[in-house]
């Protein structure tokens, strides 16, 4: 151990060390567990280059201003490696943070957790209990997989998580959580998600991360009625957080069709998903090549997706809808209420048809053959939402600007959007299940009085594979958006530039 001031110390761990050593740089410990048993508030544990085949389970907390830090030694890569660990059940993660306060993890690789059984959830990171003031920064989480090939007789499917944050205490939420500059990839999560926040979780920031090449949903902010079914419903949902500046791509069932072809959900992986949560902002993200882009939905009979804002995002080249709102068709639970979808740029989504073939839903809708879910999709029970100031740029022949499937829902406001497509075949909208190809007719049924149609927003590049969705200096979207209250529009655009310029705001994500 090397002293670092009166109140903190540095500890060193190396694969070649010995737990009988004193933990100094010259005489490092061998296991992370040995170091974590010695740390005090303010201490830092440096992991030297190499793999550590152990579960990391902190038992001591830091204090305000004295975080405990676990990190790779500068210039080296330490791996928390589950290759030789026995991983069964749920919660048996490579890194387990339970009832811990004031701790941060930096520049670690957390990898290689596998199992192939139903009802087993390999996890990279599990944060639970009453944990608070936890940071993961600059970490890579990858190759976390459940490879169970088939559904069993009980209907159990495979599950895994790169990161699972689950607030289970009704009195003390998981709080002040920061996950930033991390990378998540190569995850076989089955019917779960790569990165999940659920249950009693408040005041979280998920920013500047990259989530890609996973077989299902990338990031979900959710209620806890599934994973924490006994929780107090008044607090059993993630809330008061932000998901910003993340790059989310290739979250798709196409990654493992050998598995997903068995499921009615095949093709439904969402990049960023809000589900039964509250008061969450999703902003400045780039979401592409997912089955669906961003979702504000609910699969719950107890919890709505409510009071959320999706703004200033680039959403493009996704296989199905760009932004999805509402409950599943035929679902009679709760849905999406009092949410804002504002100042986003949607481009060339719906590269494939939808999931409905005319036989698998009560309305006998077919959005698969020569059709699509729409750049923005409203399904069941959407209430009191706002869809405004978005650039909606349709390209594929099957595309639709906005598709509202049913007559359910009420008091949704639509306005201030630009609808454009160079292809006349997709100059269409759908409202309450009926198609409209005339803009005036669309305005009459939807109440959309302030949007414009067939005006090219002049994006910098509409090259399909790598578009540049920023605006040219002559764009008609500049300075023509509707002005909303500051908490709705936010301070910055997709690039971090000032959003409102001399009381003028652009349409789309770019100011």
What are these regions (language model features)?
Residues 15-54, 442, 495, 499-500, ...:
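Acidic Gly/Asp/Thr-rich repetitive segments characteristic of extracellular carbohydrate-active
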């Amino acid at each position: 151990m090397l002293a670092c001031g009166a109140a903190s110390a540095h500890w060193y761990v190396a694969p070649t060390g010995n737990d009988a050593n004193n933990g100094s740089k010259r005489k490092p410990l061998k296991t992370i567990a040995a170091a974590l048993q010695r740390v005090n508030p303010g201490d830092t544990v440096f992991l030297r280059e190499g793999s550590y085949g152990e579960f990391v389970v902190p038992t001591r907390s830091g204090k305000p201003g004295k975080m405990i830090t676990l990190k790779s030694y500068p210039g080296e890569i330490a791996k928390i490696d589950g290759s030789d660990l026995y991983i069964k059940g749920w919660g048996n993660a490579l890194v387990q943070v339970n009832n811990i306060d004031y701790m941060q993890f930096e520049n670690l690789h957390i990898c290689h957790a596998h199992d192939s059984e139903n009802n087993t959830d390999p996890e990279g990171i599990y944060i639970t209990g009453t944990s608070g003031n936890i940071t993961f920064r600059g970490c890579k989480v990858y190759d976390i997989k459940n490879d169970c090939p088939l559904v069993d007789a009980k209907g159990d499917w495979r599950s895994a998580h790169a990161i699972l944050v689950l607030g289970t205490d009704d009195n003390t939420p998981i709080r002040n959580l920061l996950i930033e500059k991390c990378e998540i990839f190569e995850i076989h999560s089955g019917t779960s998600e790569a990165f999940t926040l659920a249950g009693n979780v408040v005041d979280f920031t998920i920013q500047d991360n990259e989530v890609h090449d996973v077989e299902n949903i990338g990031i979900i902010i959710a209620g806890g009625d599934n994973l924490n079914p006994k929780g107090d419903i008044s607090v059993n949902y993630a809330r008061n957080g932000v998901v910003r500046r993340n790059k989310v791509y290739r979250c798709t069932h196409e990654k493992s069709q050998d598995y997903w072809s068995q499921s009615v959900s095949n093709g439904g992986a969402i990049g960023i998903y809000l589900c039964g949560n509250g008061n969450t902002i999703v902003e400045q993200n780039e979401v592409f090549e997912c089955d669906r882009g961003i979702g504000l939905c609910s699969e719950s009979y107890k919890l709505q997706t409510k009071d959320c804002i999706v703004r200033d995002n680039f959403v493009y080249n996704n296989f199905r809808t760009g932004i999805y709102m509402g409950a599943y068709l035929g679902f009679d639970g709760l849905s999406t209420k009092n949410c804002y979808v504002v100042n986003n740029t949607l481009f060339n989504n719906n590269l494939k048809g939808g999931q409905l073939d005319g036989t698998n839903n009560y309305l006998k809708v077919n959005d698969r053959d020569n059709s699509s879910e729409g750049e923005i999709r409203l399904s069941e029970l959407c209430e009191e939402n706002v869809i405004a100031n978005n650039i909606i740029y349709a390209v594929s022949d099957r595309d639709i600007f906005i598709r509202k499937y049913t007559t359910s829902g009420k008091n949704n406001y639509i306005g201030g959007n630009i609808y454009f497509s160079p292809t006349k075949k997709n100059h269409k909208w759908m409202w309450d299940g009926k198609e409209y190809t005339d803009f005036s007719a669309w305005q009459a049924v939807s109440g959309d009085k302030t949007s414009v149609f067939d005006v090219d927003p002049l994006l910098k590049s509409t090259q399909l594979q790598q578009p540049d969705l920023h605006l040219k200096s002559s764009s008609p979207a500049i300075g023509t958006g509707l002005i909303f209250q500051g908490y709705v529009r936010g301070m910055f655009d997709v690039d971090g530039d000032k959003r409102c310029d001399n009381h003028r705001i652009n349409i789309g994500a770019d100011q």
